[in-house]
Amino acid sequence: MEPAIVLSISMAAVVVAITGISIYTSFGPPSKELNDPFDDHED
């Protein structure tokens, strides 16, 4: 395989992995640990 194809596939895999991790963090079990700054602020 040409180096450009390997690099393109590798970069695409990294982008998909980062997207998956961010979705898991936002909506999965770790989202319970996230806090909302608007809820923390009292007027």
From Swiss-Prot:
GO terms for biological process: photosynthesis. Keywords: Membrane, Thylakoid, Transmembrane, Transmembrane helix. One of its GO terms (cellular component) is plasma membrane-derived thylakoid membrane. The chain crosses the membrane at residues 4-24. It is found in: Cellular thylakoid membrane. Belongs to the PsbN family. PANTHER family: PROTEIN PSBN. May play a role in photosystem I and II biogenesis. NCBIfam families: PRK13183.1 (NF009650). This is Protein PsbN. The gene is psbN.
